[in-house]
Amino acid sequence: DSHVTIMQASASTLSENIEIARFAEHVGVDLIMPSYPLGFYPQHPDEVIGYTSELASATSLGMIVFAMNLWNFTRLHPSGFAPAWLEELVDTVPNIVAIKNEIGDPGVAGLADVFRRFTGRVMVSDPLEMNSPAWTQTFGMGWMGTSNYEYFGAKVPEYFALLQEPGGYDRAMEIYWQLHPARSASGMLMKESNAGTSFVHRLLWKYQGWLQGFNGGALRSPHLRLHDRQMQLLRRAALDSGLALAPGEDAEFFVGRVRA
């Protein structure tokens, strides 16, 4: 009961994503979070709002609106996902329950505006864990996701829980700084892989989880190639952060712990 399952609707068309969402509802998934297809090129904000609303209305699942600046919507609004669009969606679509808030890079003013507008109306999360101490202090952010926190073992949930407690901030920051070598390495590699691609390096994320005992193994294409220097940097940074690593040589990652 303490776990919430989220299905990311990232297929190639709206109709495919509606089909996936209905299947997810049938098998008991809790929430849906849409991506926007690579071929989706809206000419007006109403198309973004309409796509999101139609997918949300196709099931009774709660929806997390994935508001970020990498959907190629900046021609429609400089933030990449206008707060006014979110206002209309929250006001008119009753099963929108949360916002994954990544608009307006560079800087945090756009993020803060979304927190200011919507905290108390829906759940608002900045998924970048390095920002969580600021948002819990200023806006009471009580949920964070989704991202590659498994690289840090159980430490991110541990310090995030402390941030919610009166008097827990100092202890939370001790853990926060412990993780900084791993955080810095991960951030550097993600910036490197994202540059010019708008593509999250999911195989790298999967390797990060594998270091903590997750399965590893292949991903379906398309995805970016994972290089030795990247694996070596992530392994070393995790050890520098005092994280215990699961056994296994890097070659074993590509096979996976459980073979089909």
For each predicted feature, which ranges?
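Short glycine-/small-residue-rich flexible loop motifs, especially phosphate/cofactor-binding loops
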Residues: A21, S53, S132-P133, K206, ...
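Active-site beta->alpha loop and helix N-cap motifs at the rims of alpha/beta catalytic domains
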Residues: D1-P78, L224-R225, A244-A260
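A short, hydrophobic/aromatic-rich structural module that often spans a beta strand
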Residues: V27, A109-S125, H227-A244
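Glycine-centered loop/turn motif at secondary-structure junctions
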Residues: S2, G28, V93, F139-G140, ...
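C-terminal alpha-helical cap/extension of soluble enzyme domains
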Residues: Y151-A260
